[in-house]
Amino acid sequence: MSDGDYDYLIKFLALGDSGVGKTSVLYQYTDGKFNSKFITTVGIDFREKRVVYRANGPDGAIGRGQRIHLQLWDTAGQERFRSLTTAFFRDAMGFLLLFDLTNEQSFLNVRNWISQLQMHAYCENPDIVLCGNKSDLEDQRVVKEEDARGLAEKYGIPYFETSAANGTNISQAIEMLLDLIMKRMERCVDKSWIPEGVVRSNGHTSTDHLNEAKEKGICGC
C-alpha cells in the first residue's frame, strides 16, 4: 500500500510500567527485530505498519479485506510522564497493556493502568489486550500464568504471554486488538460514528458522533 492508500488509520497505544518492554514489543511487530539496548522512552514515540483486516462473517465466510494503517504509540512508563501519557489516551482506539512476567510490581500496577484508562480513554470500556511480556525468561518468572489470566478475566479482556526477544504471540495480541476495534466499529449502525483514534482515508473523524451514538445505545462503548 502506498501513502494514503488505506481504508482506515487506527491508533493503538502501548502502555505499562517503565521497563516492561513496550518499545521492544512494537519494534518486533513492525520490523521483526529485537534490540535489547533500547533507551527508556521519554514522552511519546510511535511506529507504523500497514495490514489487511478480513472479518469472518456469521456463516464463516471471509469478508472483503479492509486496508488498515496502524499507528502504534509507545508511551513512557515513568510516573513523571504520566500526565503526558494520559493526554494521549482519548486519541487512541485500542490499548496494548503490558507488564513484565519477571517483575511482580509491574503486574500489580495493571489495575492502576486500567483505572487510568477508564477515566481518560474515549469511553469507560475501551478495548484492551493484556500482555505478560518476557515469557522467554522462564527461569526469572515471578508472575504465575493463572494469576495473570484471572486478572484478565476479572476485567473481561484477552491475555497473551509475549516475548519481544523471539516474537512469541506479539502479532496475535495486536491482531486480537485490531479485531476488537473493527467489531466495535461494525456495531455502530452508521459507520461515520467512529472515535478519534480511527481516521478514514479521507481524513474524516468525529468523537462527537461517537458520543451521540453512545447516548442512543448504538455503539458498543
From Swiss-Prot:
Summary of subunit composition and partner proteins: Binds SYTL1, SLAC2B, MYRIP, SYTL3, SYTL4 and SYTL5. Interacts with RPH3A and RPH3A. Binds MLPH and SYTL2. Interacts with UNC13D. Does not interact with the BLOC-3 complex (heterodimer of HPS1 and HPS4). Interacts (GDP-bound form preferentially) with DENND10.
An annotated GO BP: exocytosis
Family of the protein in this entry: Belongs to the small GTPase superfamily. Rab family.
Modified residues (Phosphoserine): S2
UniProt xrefs under InterPro entries: P-loop_NTPase, Rab27a/b, Small_GTP-bd, Small_GTPase, Small_GTPase_Rab
UniProt xrefs under SMART domains: RAB (SM00175), RAN (SM00176), RAS (SM00173), RHO (SM00174)
Motif (Effector region): 38-46
Catalytic activity: GTP + H2O = GDP + phosphate + H(+)
Name the UniProt record assigns to this protein: Ras-related protein Rab-27A
